[in-house]
Amino acid sequence: MAAAGRAARPLVAGGRQLRVPLRWRGQVAAAAPSTKPQAEPETRKPKTGILMLNMGGPERLDDVHDFLLRLFLDRDLMTLPAQNKLAPFIAKRRTPRIQEQYSRIGGGSPIKKWTAVQGEGMVKLLDSMSPQTAPHKYYIGFRYVHPLTEEAIEEMEDDGIERAIAFTQYPQYSCSTTGSSLNAIYRYYNKKGKKPKMKWSIIDRWPTHPLLIQCFADHIQKELDLFPPDKRKDVVILFSAHSLPMSVVNRGDPYPQEVGATVQRVMEKLNHSNPYRLVWQSKVGPMPWLVPQTDETIKGLCQRGKKNMLLVPIAFTSDHIETLYELDIEYAQVLANECGVENIRRAESLNGNPLFSKALADLVCSHIQSNEICSKQLTLCCPLCVNPVCRETKAFFTNQQL
């Protein structure tokens, strides 16, 4: 996978050679290493459960519709008029187009496989780093595909977990992502009308963790080294993150600031070797979102003579459709060819990097040692919050007793 990520193939555009990353989309899902059992399997009942929270992605084309339906029904993510009726209509209408995109990257999302690889590496390290809370077991809790967050909680309860850690896999907090996953945990218990058997705490954000920053910097430097030597210092690094509607930002969502903090630390680690910008991708609909947009930035740089670029997915830790299709195909191939880019590459996602598993283990170990329920930031609602469930969720977690 790493070797394939470093290779490039030329495209000829207007007499110029356009170099784009060569990553075989058709083999992406299969490229994730399988989760292997430990040499000496753990036979004791797990004591500490780490619930790895993320949105997930459809593994098969047949899963796309249900994925979209759950997504458009999520009122923590978006509010639509007559949502229960409109969401099924939108999901049905968009399914063929999204299925086509997934077919271009191998027929499904590899995010579950990469999460399993990361979780496996994390718990192996944790058992030696924190023997007093061992054995540790990771669980995957997705919002929009199986295993759903609620299904993971049931498995944790059935396993007799004593200490449960809700660990967001979004380094930067947003009410639309991490907040939605935490609300799902609260709703699970509220709907059943029972108190948790497990003692819950949360790792709700980690935008500047040193090992996370080191991983990003290492992946960026690897790609920079593959640009022509005479172009290398002029390469513009475009840190691309999923955008957010300005209506959410204006309520006080901390996501833009936390993404910016990650970018700043990464550039400090790189000694500010190159010019850079933070840009935003995946805007949907006509309403205002964060700007500048990734695609518009690529066009604008080309028009101004800056034609060597490195795309960095800074808010994603695993490959999924927004890296493999939107960045790799829509931007690094189609758009770059149209607007005359000379060299464009994409930094590999963190995926199976052993240092990233170490980062996850360090985050959990430090969290356990802190004996804190959550970060101070989580206790503060957005100043103009309009979602009462957020306040109920925060109260649910802050009232936990470790």
UniProtKB/Swiss-Prot annotation:
The keyword Membrane applies. [2Fe-2S] cluster binds at residues 175, 382, 385, 390. Residues 1-33 form a transit peptide. Pathway: Porphyrin-containing compound metabolism; protoheme biosynthesis; protoheme from protoporphyrin-IX: step 1/1. One of its GO terms (biological process) is heme biosynthetic process. It comes from the Eukaryota. Catalyzes the ferrous insertion into protoporphyrin IX. It is a peripheral membrane protein. This is Ferrochelatase, mitochondrial. Binds 1 [2Fe-2S] cluster. Its cofactor is [2Fe-2S] cluster. One of its GO terms (molecular function) is metal ion binding. Keywords: 2Fe-2S, Heme biosynthesis, Iron, Iron-sulfur, Lyase, Membrane, Metal-binding, Mitochondrion, Mitochondrion inner membrane, Porphyrin biosynthesis, Transit peptide. Transmembrane segments: none annotated. Protoporphyrin IX binds at residues 94, 102, 109. It is found in: Mitochondrion inner membrane. InterPro entries: Ferrochelatase, Ferrochelatase_AS, Ferrochelatase_C, Ferrochelatase_N. One of its GO terms (cellular component) is mitochondrion. The active site is at residues 209, 362. It catalyses: heme b + 2 H(+) = protoporphyrin IX + Fe(2+). It comes from Gallus gallus (Chicken). Its EC number is 4.98.1.1. PROSITE patterns: FERROCHELATASE.
